[in-house]
UniProtKB/Swiss-Prot annotation:
The active site is at 143 (nucleophile), 618 (proton acceptor). This is Ubiquitin carboxyl-terminal hydrolase 9. The lineage of its organism: Eukaryota, Fungi, Dikarya, Ascomycota, Saccharomycotina. Residues 42-58, 222-233 have a biased composition (Low complexity). It catalyses: Thiol-dependent hydrolysis of ester, thioester, amide, peptide and isopeptide bonds formed by the C-terminal Gly of ubiquitin (a 76-residue protein attached to proteins as an intracellular targeting signal). Belongs to the peptidase C19 family. It comes from Saccharomyces cerevisiae (strain ATCC 204508 / S288c) (Baker's yeast). InterPro entries: Papain-like_cys_pep_sf, Peptidase_C19, Peptidase_C19_UCH, USP_CS, USP_dom. Residues 194-209 have a biased composition (Polar residues). The keyword Protease applies. Its EC number is 3.4.19.12. One of its GO terms (biological process) is regulation of protein stability. Residues 1-76, 194-273, 726-754 are annotated as: Disordered. It comes from the Eukaryota.
Amino acid sequence: MIKRWLSVNRKKSHPEKNTQGNDEINRKATSLKKTKGSGDPSIAKSPSAKSSTSSIPSNLASHERRSKFSSQTDNLAGNKHYHEHYHNMASTSDEREYDSSTTYEDRAFDTESSILFTTITDLMPYGDGSNKVFGYENFGNTCYCNSVLQCLYNIPEFRCNVLRYPERVAAVNRIRKSDLKGSKIRVFTNESFETSTNSGNSNTGYQSNDNEDAHNHHHLQQSDQDNSSSSTQEKQNNFERKRNSFMGFGKDKSNYKDSAKKDDNNEMERPQPVHTVVMASDTLTEKLHEGCKKIIVGRPLLKQSDSLSKASTTDCQANSHCQCDSQGSRITSVDDDVLVNPESCNDAVNNSNNNKENTFPTSEQRKKAALIRGPVLNVDHLLYPTEEATLYNGLKDIFESITENLSLTGIVSPTEFVKILKKENVLFNTMMQQDAHEFLNFLLNDFSEYIQRNNPRMRFGPQKTDNSNDNFITDLFKGTLTNRIKCLTCDNITSRDEPFLDFPIEVQGDEETDIQKMLKSYHQREMLNGVNKFYCNKCYGLQEAERMVGLKQLPHILSLHLKRFKYSEEQKSNIKLFNKILYPLTLDVSSTFNTSVYKKYELSGVVIHMGSGPQHGHYVCICRNEKFGWLLYDDETVESIKEETVLQFTGHPGDQTTAYVLFYKETQADKTENQNENIDTSSQDQMQTDNNIEQLIKCDDWLRDRKLRAAANIERKKTLGNIPEVKTAETKTPLNDKKRNKQKRKSRILSFIK
């Protein structure tokens, strides 16, 4: 069953079968063949169908109705395409390379779990991405960007629209982005965090992309020089030991020269670790993570190392040529002459926890573990070079890289997206801390303009008309406010509509604000008098008037901006207001202008600002995932939290961690009423999300463990192949057989008889 999830349609990808991308995909897909035995995590069979269903955006429904291919036909075709992927990948040319991994007694997942299988269509041939949990790498005060992108990804309607439009190349010629390393491979080890001093906040903890590259290059040059000198000396010592050892006796010196050249090539090809700085732990960040239930991205590598050690010990006992240490741990080969312990790759995380085995890992330790554990998807270039370098295409590449990756968890490095952002808006091209709301507003407007410009290409299916005005950004986020100004002299009323993509929540003085009370019957009244008199077109003069603001149209996704930042005349700068602002999990919104304007919302995401002012601080976000419940995203790390933790960031002078942007998603009134009637619904939902998280972690650990053991087995083969005794035994065996066959021939006359 696991083959269906981790493979590519070999039949449809035949024109590109010789490309490097498909070879890599085939190797990874065939490494997950079903085998019998014990060792895999047991996962309860999900009662769901073969593919989980996700919410369909409002504008998509109209597209699919107009399309001659109905949604059922689309799903059937997608499922057929999906099954062809994973059936055809069972037999590939690279199967021989990973076939030895079946010696480890692993049992594949015999389940139709929604964690592995998601909704697929012709426009989303690799699923809708609802089963992926990825963190975002911070490139230097980019936490404002990471938090907003995480909230948008966890809105199914937004994510599916970005994945579907504009339509990519046909599925026949499309290559799955199973493992995106980028132009510059980002590899993190324990040494990656030793060259710089960690900083306490995100302002000083990172550098810009350009500066970071130069900074990394400087350190890499130093590390390369040190590594080259030490590695050269080590190679010479290894050659001397081999020359004096029994295994190396009688070996030609030219072989050593060839081996040295091979080692130099391997050293050049092996990617050097990236040197970076992660945000140091402090009381503010540790208090934020107090409500953590389960670490998803950033958990230690203990499970992988333990299982790898057990499998390696078993293999060592079965193979006399495999070298083991005193503890029975497996020794694998990195190159021809240097043997290392595979458990050393976990020391970066385990060393930091040696003295805290029974304590919860800090946020700094989790971020280091997440970067080392990987995979790190470095999206540092446009995946389709012929397309325009826009923010929309950059975000689409990020979403596709997450959705199509073979791993369930990991980290994304949005290098190209941040680069495009700094080019599109010079206000973000600085090392200063940026405003998350300003970024969200600019992003949605930029997306809307891009869709309007490319509207004919954004159509669903084969029916593409030029007279269509569909724009899923406006369909999801656009609302309308009505301004009515009544002249108190002639009673003339002037009306004007104002669209909005995010709704402002004003903060007045030291007052407490209740969002539910404010939006239950929303209206604002203001008297226009004195210097603010209104010019009446009927009276032809400035008159006193009354202005009323109400809601005319409500959006599907209601984003609320809590205006905590304001300019202070006394301090001559922007300050942060710590007024208490209450926000509910379910929100009722209506208008006094029109009683028919009414919608019920449920909280979907919260962007949180940590700090005493707008010029500095740190952004994190809390999102409600459709499969895994409430998740806390802190740049590289992701963890599940309790529902009551979501409502704790209301703000007060003693707490600098406050909610800043709220995302509410429209829900059906009947659904909420049924939930109120059924007391056990919330507990059942909580049990389901907890079970999904357990499945996610077990699946992810199993896949990573499988990959490590397959790689270790290949390295073991290389090591055994370089041992002269093994080579001699392999070469002598066929010769002895030939001699025995010749000895059976007693007469040359009858030698033609076999």
